[in-house]
Every structure is written in structure tokens, then in C-alpha cells.
């Protein structure tokens, strides 16, 4: 069994900087040689183009390896500790993702269509007795078009969502099935029949609420809950989508445009990174804490 390397903060920070710098260099080389390969083939300089093509693959491989090494360092030395501080029974897979079926089952009301799912940083655990799953998610749509020049059909992939996705199982039937979406004119036109106007102008301005029954939306989204969601959305760093499913699950998706546990352009400071990751995790746990206190969340048992 592979042992995790124990590193001091100074050593870890140096290793993180090294892999990030190397990854950046190889990414630039990959793009440059890739462009050069295209131009050389266009100029019919085939022998040279073949050489640059091989180098493009070599540089791309090195870029990928440094990216994987960076992710593993973060996961082993910072992310795992932050997750264990927040959740219990943690299972963390840096290169795993939420099952596509789970995402589809949410029935999230998006202003776009998607045909594929991928992601990373899959987390599974429990939070105060609730079963939780969380991961980076990327949704993309593949469309086909005919290339007149090559006289072939080509697939074109477009990213429509990139961000974080939480699934929390409350273990009880909820009092309704309600979806919240970032407000968009196109969505309002599509959902004239099942949209619900709430008694909060600011909330209506930010979210489109859809439900089979307006009463269920009013029951779940109390005035206090709407104020909390508005406040949380203001700190989310992207569009917020939510799905309260009658079976007991809550889905929260935030379109941040980035991965969760990443170094990015941040300074490679271990303590700051740890606090950053904890802060992002607490954004999600704050929503769960707030909902657990809501008397109107669960379906009331009726006597026989």
C-alpha cells in the first residue's frame, strides 16, 4: 500500500509552486506547438509537422502529469484534512465525480441543455447524520455540424456549466418538490405554467421558482428561508440552482466556472488554502444547517 509522503509546510508550498509552474510552461508549449503543427500541415511541410505533432503530444502528457501531481499533493496534504474537519466517514476521490444519474434525477431547471457530464473531486460522507455527496461538475453539450471544406460531419463540444454540486439526503420525505433557478427571461417564458411568484421582490428578481403546486413552494420557502438563500447566493461566486425533491434529497449547484479544490493563481500558502477550502465547504453546510431547523421542510405525518 502506497504511503503518503509527510512534508513540512515549506516543502509542500515549494512542491505546489513547482508543479504549477511546470504545468504552465508545458501548457504554453502544447498550445504553441499545436498551433505550429496546424500551420505546418497547411503549408504542406509534412515532415516537420509530424515532428511538432509528436512534441505536442509529449508536452501535453507532461502538462497532464504535473496537473495530476498538483491535485494529489493538494488532496493528500490539505483537502483531506479540511474534509475530515467538516464531515464524518469521508470518502474522497480526486478524479471521481457524482454519478450522472444522480445529476439527471435532480431535474434541475437550467436555461440550457446538456448531453454529457464529467467532473472531479468527488466527496462522500455524513454531516450531522445526513448523507452527503459533493463534487466538481462540468456539463457539456455536443452538437454536430457539416464541414464543407472536409466534407465530413464534426462534433463540437460546448461547456454549459462548470462548478460545484451538492446532494444532501435528509432521509425523510420533503413537504414538496420545488426548483430554484437563476432568473432568466428564457426560463420564465418556458415555465409560465409552473412558475411561482413569491412574496419577496428581491427573491423573485434573483430566482425563478417552479413547482407543481404553488402551495408547496410557499410552504418550503418561508420568508426567513428566502432571506437566507438570498444572502448565501450573494456569497456563492456564481449562479445558484436548487432542487428540493419530494423523496428527501436536496441538490444545490453553483456555476462558479472553476474547480473546487484548486490552487489556481492563489499564493501557495498552506494555511490560507486550508482556510479557503474550509470556507467553501462551510457555504454548503450552512445551507444544510439552516434547512434542518426549518419546521416546514418535512412532510407532516397524517393520522389514520
Which ranges hold each PLM region?
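Generic L/I/V-rich hydrophobic alpha-helical segments across diverse proteins
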Residues: 26, 33, 52, 56-59
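Hydrophobic alpha-helical transmembrane segments
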Residues: 38-55
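Loop-to-transmembrane boundary segments
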Residues: 17-29, 108, 113
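Conserved oxyanion/phosphate-binding beta-strand-loop segments in alpha/beta enzyme cores
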Residues: 89
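Canonical alpha-helical transmembrane segments of integral membrane proteins
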Residues: 24-43
Amino acid at each position: 500500500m502506497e504511503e503518503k509522503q509527510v512534508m513540512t509546510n515549506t516543502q509542500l508550498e515549494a512542491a505546489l509552486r513547482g508543479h504549477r509552474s511546470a504545468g504552465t510552461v508545458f501548457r504554453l508549449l502544447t498550445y504553441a506547438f499545436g498551433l505550429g503543427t496546424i500551420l505546418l500541415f497547411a503549408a504542406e511541410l509534412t515532415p516537420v509537422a509530424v515532428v511538432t505533432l509528436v512534441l505536442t503530444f509529449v508536452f501535453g502528457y507532461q502538462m497532464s502529469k504535473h496537473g495530476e501531481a498538483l491535485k494529489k499533493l493538494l488532496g493528500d496534504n490539505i483537502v483531506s484534512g479540511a474534509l475530515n474537519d467538516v464531515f464524518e466517514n469521508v470518502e474522497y476521490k480526486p478524479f471521481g465525480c457524482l454519478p450522472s444519474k444522480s445529476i439527471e434525477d435532480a431535474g434541475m431547471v437550467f436555461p440550457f441543455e446538456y448531453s454529457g457530464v464529467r467532473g472531479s473531486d468527488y466527496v462522500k460522507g455524513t454531516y450531522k447524520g445526513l448523507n452527503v455527496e459533493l463534487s466538481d461538475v462540468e456539463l457539456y453539450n455536443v452538437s454536430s455540424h457539416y464541414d464543407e471544406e472536409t466534407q465530413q460531419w464534426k462534433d463540437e463540444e460546448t461547456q454549459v456549466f462548470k462548478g460545484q454540486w451538492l446532494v444532501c439526503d435528509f432521509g425523510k420525505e420533503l413537504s414538496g418538490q420545488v426548483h430554484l433557478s437563476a432568473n432568466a427571461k428564457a426560463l420564465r417564458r418556458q415555465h409560465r405554467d409552473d412558475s411561482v411568484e413569491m412574496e419577496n421582490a428581491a427573491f423573485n428578481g434573483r430566482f425563478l421558482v417552479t413547482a407543481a403546486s404553488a402551495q408547496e413552494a410557499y410552504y418550503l420557502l418561508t420568508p426567513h428561508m428566502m432571506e437566507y438563500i438570498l444572502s448565501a447566493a450573494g456569497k456563492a461566486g456564481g449562479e445558484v440552482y436548487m432542487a428540493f425533491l419530494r423523496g428527501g434529497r436536496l441538490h444545490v449547484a453553483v456555476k462558479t466556472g472553476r474547480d473546487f479544490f484548486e490552487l489556481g493563481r492563489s499564493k501557495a500558502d498552506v494555511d490560507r488554502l486550508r482556510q479557503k477550502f474550509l470556507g467553501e465547504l462551510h457555504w454548503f453546510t450552512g445551507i444544510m444547517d439552516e434547512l434542518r431547523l426549518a419546521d416546514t421542510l418535512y412532510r407532516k405525518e397524517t393520522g389514520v
